Amino acid sequence: MLAMTLKEFRQVVRDHRTLAMLIVMPVVLLLVFGYAASFDVDVIPTAVVGPGATNVPEQLPELFDVETADADATRANAEEMLRAGEVNLAVVTGDGPPVVLLDGSELFMARAAVQILAAAPIPGLDYVVLFNPELDTSAVLVPGLAGLIIVFVGTLVTSMSVVRERETGTLEQLAVMPFRPRDVFMGKIAPYFLIASIDIVIVLTIGTLLFDVPLNGSVLPLIVGALAFLFVALGVGVLISSVSENQAQAIQLALMTALPQIMLSGIIFPLSSMAPAVRWIGYLLPLTYFNQVAKGVMLRGAGLGDLLMPLALLVALGAVIFTLAVTRFRSQLRPARVRAAT
Amino acid sequence: MRVVAVTALSKRFGEVRAVDDLTFEVGQGEIVGLLGANGAGKTTTMRMVLGLLAPTSGRALIEGEPVGRVDRRRLGYVPQGLGLYRELTVAENLRFSAEAFGTAPPDLAAEGLSEYANRKVGELPRGVTRRVAFVAARLHDPGVLILDEPTSGVGPLGRARLWESIHLVAETGTAVLVSTHHMEEAEECDRVVLMAQGRRVATGNVSEVISGLRTVAVVAGVTTARLDEIRRLGGTVLLSNDGWRVVGLPLSVVSEVVGSGTEVPATFEEAFVALSA
Amino acid sequence: MSWGLSRVTVRFGDATALAGVSIDVEPGEVAIVVGADGAGKTTLCRTLVGLEGIDGGEIRRPDRTGFQPETSGVWNDLTVMENLEFVAGAYGLATDPARRRIETLLEVTGLGGARDRLGRQLSGGMRQKLGVAMAVLSDPELLVLDEPTTGLDPVSRLELWSFISLTAGEGKAILVTTTYTDEARRGNSVLALDGGRSLASGSVAEVIDAMPGALFESARSHGPSSWRRGRTWRIWSPEAEPVPGATEVSPDLADVVTVAALAAEARR
């Protein structure tokens, strides 16, 4: 047994990659997630509308960070802003007592607001929770969860697609056939795309039925978002596949891309609560934007126009992944040509 | 025009020179064999000729064009692992290749493969899958056929049959580049390129390679001490049916140490040893 | 007392890897198993050392066997010395005798100068020699080597065979498998395997003598029992009838194995 232990020790010490993972990874992960994990709400972007727009803001608790004060805007305008996610709280002033509109799809902000208002009630101020009146956790979690599951499974499955070809030697054959690198990329994604699309529908349907998640908006923006999101998730998988030497490595990398998405995409810990140094990682993750789109459509009934930004970003991410993967393929399938070009 | 022209081709992986200043050509209808042990650089060379690996220096041209720009349809390749999809059937594999190259799928009956058409490649014996890979590589009538150790692990009958097929393909005008580590297969090639440690140590047909090289045959009954002495002097000692043969030392030197010996023409294997020393 | 297999059959599900195969390996002698990939050489080796169960027949195996698998058996990220020390430790060999034995083996194989080199940095020939040394280190009575010479250059092959002969000279029984028919003459006995079945067995001379019919050489093929050999064709005549335009030649082992394979094919 001693001989065995000694041998293993020697092998591990020589395996620099695994050693780096064992020592460096836990430290990095702790730092990143430590700064990310926070339910504390520091600011709630707020809008004040109606005739009281000028003097109401100073009366509001500090937590309500007034970004817009528009005397000419109406309650309908305020609801629009909330639906589009521009602000998460609106104070509607008018003839009667002011009404506070809360965005129920931002659970922690809504709860923080309710707490503050209950603790130090402003006389005559009433509040209404829009979009998730019960402040139900599942309603807020399920859309994001669905996305997480899809990204996890989708990336994992496609991450092995190219590696398998390399291991069986068929990648070389593809390289000597008249295929263009983008043919190979799209061909590899296509079947998974179809299956995963059906998957998303199933997962979201079950989610809405079992967990009482509403579907308040039109399905179109959701579909657009889901398709763009899928393209990115599967594309990342293929990209991982093209840089992995074997299936074990591919799975490792796929898992490593899944972990940050749980913690940093805003599905559990709100992005606004994260330290800025860590928050930017969240802005690079496709799940962050799918979460915004899914919650926006399902809970807030947001339309295409409201969700233009996250949708555009998803499409942009897709384009970046596509370019990276195709470039990577080109250097693998036609290295001699790449050389000649330089 | 030479179909395949390799000039001063080199490939370095860090400190290791996998291929070192290699030059050779393959003409239309010619069978050229890359001969050498594992690690001599045969597979690396082939991958550079196919454009799968970029050389560190030197160049490879196919039909006068740099390999990166060659129309893939001019190439046919059977790698060591055969390059077939194990979960797909023979028919599906061949159809995929045919479609990729834009030709009609081959006639399975004519190739003697109809009984295996709907069997998965992963379930068939090596001999059959080798033939399938061979068909897949030439169904688009390539100008160049590159075969990486097609006879590795094949018994004598299988090897003979494979070489028959290779000769038939060459007769249609295809240039064939084959690699092997069986010395006796040098006879099957029009020309051989002997490789050792990435370098070309000889080229030509079998008689040209052997030409003039002599070995000293020594009858059995020589002590180990004497053999060690021969080795110290720089000779290589090989076993033969009836004694020892010494490569690399002249008769006079050998006789002095051992007391006897006759000069005989070298075998191909002995020539290889002498040239790669 | 010879080691080996007696009419052993090994099945994996529906496939029969070995069918009624017998082989004897005498102490102090080298038995050679020749066959193509998939013929059953590796299964035979693994069965003989006890890594595979059998579905019929008997195995005669000593307590101490040494085995070198097809993949050389060397650990790539350990040095030559560490590889040998590991084997010594695994077998619980006493330190001093083990160290002496390791030194002797390093000298005999010529690996002394490479003792601190990592397994993956060794040339093919050196790696194979190390693998054999590791199999022999524990002083087994039966040594089984699976394709130690495949893919090696002629000089390394010769050095490996010298090492094997030396080890046989120490009284060990050795079984070596190979795909090169010309290596069969290095052994005391040969077994030709094809598809799990024995095509021929005995000493090389016996096997060649036992070939049925006669062998001819011609510039052209003649019927289904012809095959290319270099620039000419070999033609087998099962009934020893002369073939027009061909000259009779004496067969070597490769010819005999080919004939046996042809005959087996005809029977199927």
Report each predicted region and the residues it spans.
Chain C
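Conserved structural motif at the start of ABC-family nucleotide-binding domains
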Residues: 3-5, 18
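The feature captures the beta-strand-to-loop junction immediately N-terminal to the Walker
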Residues: 34-36
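Helix-to-loop junction immediately C-terminal to a conserved catalytic motif
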Residues: 49
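Conserved ABC ATPase "signature" region
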Residues: 85, 89, 96-114
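Catalytic Walker B motif of ABC-type/P-loop ATPase nucleotide-binding domains
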Residues: 143-147
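ABC transporter nucleotide-binding domain
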Residues: 159-175, 179-237
